[in-house]
Amino acid sequence: MSDLQASTAAGQRGPADHSIRDQIIEAADEHFSRYGYGKTTVADLAKTIGFSKAYIYKFFESKQAIGEAICARCLGTVTTAVRESLAQGKSATDKLRRLLKTIAVSTTEIAFNDQKIYEIAAYSCAEKWASSTNYLEEISGIIADIITEGRASGEFERKTPIDEAVRAIMLAFQPFMNPVMLQYNLEAVPEGVNEVTGLILRSLAP
């Protein structure tokens, strides 16, 4: 199980594969999409789904736990898109370009297609939910692997400690991967993404 998959269990109760759990998540996803995460209570969800609050609490310990499950699923679509794109990469340089572009485009699509669900992603980043922190750890791990590959092939410099290089790349790309920051940088996609990517690659050059 990946870190991102593990994060979906945060605050959940009962069998992980229980159909009722999925039903609650689906209904909550739809409700949050319509009314927003911040304005919704567990009582609202219970009324919408037709369950009692007590029954929902058998599967989730809080509204945040439900939000975590939705957020993890949402961020999971981003990492899936990233890995599918990386599978087509021809070099470490190409893979890093693909990684950063896919993250920016996928996150932007979420922002445009479902603003209310995007709100949950923003909550997760601002409040450092497990679904968000594990997502960032997974992306950091992918970047570390790409840097290692690039150093082995002679594409990237070898002086900077890998963990330092990864942190720097993650910090530089925050405006396009952090939902809280991206909402203020939507007009910079894709030109700004390409410029930041170019700057990152030049810093990695031997």
Model feature map: region roles:
Residues D3, V105-E109, S140, A144-D145, ...:
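Amphipathic C-terminal alpha-helical segment
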Residues Q23, A27, H31-A65, A69:
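Helix-turn-helix
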Residues A69, R73, V82-E109, I162, ...:
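Hydrophobic alpha-helical connector segments
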